[in-house]
UniProtKB/Swiss-Prot annotation:
It catalyses: 2 D-sedoheptulose 7-phosphate = D-glycero-alpha-D-manno-heptose 7-phosphate + D-glycero-beta-D-manno-heptose 7-phosphate. GO terms for molecular function: carbohydrate derivative binding; D-sedoheptulose 7-phosphate isomerase activity; zinc ion binding. Catalyzes the isomerization of sedoheptulose 7-phosphate in D-glycero-D-manno-heptose 7-phosphate. The reaction produces a racemic mixture of D-glycero-alpha-D-manno-heptose 7-phosphate and D-glycero-beta-D-manno-heptose 7-phosphate. The lineage of its organism: Bacteria, Pseudomonadati, Pseudomonadota, Gammaproteobacteria, Alteromonadales. This is Phosphoheptose isomerase. It comes from Shewanella woodyi (strain ATCC 51908 / MS32).
Length: 195
């Protein structure tokens, strides 16, 4: 059992090392897009399922409250939190539409959708991307594995941050680190601090 625990740490570290080579440019581009969005008076919507829903909420909380520096709140909405809305849409229409209907109501041109899926195959996140694109929003996709169908929906105006791993747990761990990098870059760009 101890060896298995140590192996989890080793695999997590190696995945982060691999990601440190593969992802910085994508993360920096996504952060730059988010800063531009926020400076333009727009907002960031975020969605995902399960652990990715938790990541969407984590990102939103870091922007609405603060990350590591004191600053004014920034507009971000996790589309995963309103159980009445989610269950109404799932019951009356389909689970695949729980995010897309919210985006059609709340999304505006210039907004960003942070779409999170470890596999890139989540039907409701795919529909969310389609809805966001129909509203002239930009997409930042956090994925893993081969990027799935989500990757195929993205254009050169969007950014995919694809973790180089096939392990859901390792992908989720790097997604959280990527989210923290996004928040740090947003804060440091909008509110420079003396180091």
């Amino acid at each position: 059992m101890l060896e298995r625990i140590k192996d989890s740490f080793t695999h997590s570290i190696q995945t982060k090392i691999d990601a440190s080579e593969a992802l910085p440019e994508s993360i920096a581009k996504a952060a730059e897009m988010m800063v531009h969005c926020l400076l333009g008076g727009n907002k960031i919507l975020a969605c995902g399922n399960g652990g990715s829903a938790g990541d969407a909420q984590h990102f939103s909380a870091e922007l609405l409250n603060r990350f590591e520096v004191e600053r004014p709140p920034l507009p971000a909405i996790a589309l995963t939190t309103d159980t009445s809305t989610i269950t109404a849409i799932a019951n009356d229409y389909s689970y695949d539409e729980i995010f897309s209907k919210q985006i059609l109501a709340l999304g505006q041109p210039g907004d960003i959708l942070l779409a999170i899926s470890t596999s890139g195959h989540s039907g409701n996140v795919i529909k969310a991307i389609e809805a966001a694109l129909s509203r002239d929003m930009t997409i930042v996709a956090l994925t893993g594995k081969d990027g799935g169908p989500m990757a195929g929906l993205l254009s050169i105006n969007d950014v995919e941050i694809r973790v180089p791993s096939n392990s859901t747990a390792r992908i989720q761990e790097v997604h959280l680190l990527a989210i923290h990098c996004l928040c740090d870059n947003i804060d440091r760009t909008l509110f420079p601090q003396d180091e």
